[in-house]
């Protein structure tokens, strides 16, 4: 056992200055070596419609969140983010008017939800630009935000069908049909605008991030659904996910 004198000498030799922090990108605020900004569109996209992201506060702490990719990929004012657990609050300036707009639609599965593809794209039959509301959080968080915000119950709800497999390959999704916030917003916006190029351009930073991570030791992730079917998922699953998987057809 070390003597008290030795212990104090070792403590005294520890550098009192904090470790050097890595330089961060002034835009995405990620360390420069892992910045995904080079994947953003060369010119910010300016669709007629705009995205309205209602974000759970816990999302801010996630290091690989994708909502900022929408913020910096779209022209200023085309992607508005409001943070909270219920909406609208006094600090959410302008949100009440947006939610009351007849051209506002929300991606959320309800009994009355219609498929997004069934809506007229902007310009068809005089359709004006949409306000597309997306709840940003885990499914339990999104569900809580919806139920805690009565005004959302009066917003026309829509759903995406025939979803592609997520291209966010360095993150494990709950099921094969789950998409990141970026992928959801990009796909939905391209449908409402009738322009598939919007999706392709907005996904640029996600592709850049995944490519960099895979080149530096990350591995491709399969969904929890896929791994459970293959009996390779090590964790216990909740009752809700187990119920979902029981009704899904086997491949």
Regions found by a protein language model. Give the residues of each.
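Short cysteine-rich clusters marking metal-coordination/redox-active sites
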Residues: 25-28
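S-adenosyl-L-methionine/SAH cofactor-binding core of RNA-modifying enzymes
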Residues: 75-147, 151
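Short metal-coordination and nucleic-acid-contact micro-motifs, chiefly zinc-binding Cys/His arrays
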Residues: 21, 31, 47
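Histidine-anchored nucleotide/phosphate-binding helix
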Residues: 38, 62-73
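Short Cys/His-rich Zn2+-coordinating modules
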Residues: 2-19
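C-terminal folded domains that constitute the principal catalytic or ligand-binding module
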Residues: 131, 139-251
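N-terminal accessory regions of nucleic-acid-interacting proteins
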Residues: 37-39, 53
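Short Cys/His-rich local motifs and their 1-3 flanking residues in nucleic-acid-associated proteins
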Residues: 30-33, 37
């Amino acid at each position: 056992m070390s003597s008290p004198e030795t212990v104090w000498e070792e403590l005294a030799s520890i550098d009192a200055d904090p470790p050097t922090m890595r330089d961060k990108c002034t835009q995405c605020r990620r360390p420069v070596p892992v910045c995904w900004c080079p994947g953003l569109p060369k010119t910010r996209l300016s669709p007629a419609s705009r995205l309205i992201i209602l974000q759970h506060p816990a999302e801010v702490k996630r290091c690989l969140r994708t909502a900022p990719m929408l913020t910096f990929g779209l022209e200023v004012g085309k992607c508005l983010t409001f943070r909270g657990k219920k909406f609208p609050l006094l600090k959410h300036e302008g949100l009440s008017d947006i939610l009351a707009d007849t051209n506002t639609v929300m991606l959320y599965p309800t009994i009355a939800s219609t498929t997004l593809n069934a809506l007229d794209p902007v310009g068809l039959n005089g359709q004006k630009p949409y306000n597309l509301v997306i709840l940003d959080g885990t499914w339990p968080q999104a569900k809580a935000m919806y139920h805690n915000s009565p005004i959302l119950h009066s917003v026309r709800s829509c759903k995406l069908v025939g979803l592609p497999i997520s291209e966010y390959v360095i993150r494990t999704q709950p099921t094969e049909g789950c998409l990141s916030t970026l992928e959801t917003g990009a796909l939905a916006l391209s449908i409402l605008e009738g322009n598939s190029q919007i999706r392709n351009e907005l996904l640029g930073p996600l592709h850049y991030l995944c490519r960099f991570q895979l080149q530096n030791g990350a591995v491709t992730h399969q969904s929890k659904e896929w791994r459970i079917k293959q009996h390779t998922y090590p964790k216990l699953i909740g009752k809700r996910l187990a119920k979902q998987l029981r009704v899904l057809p086997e491949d």
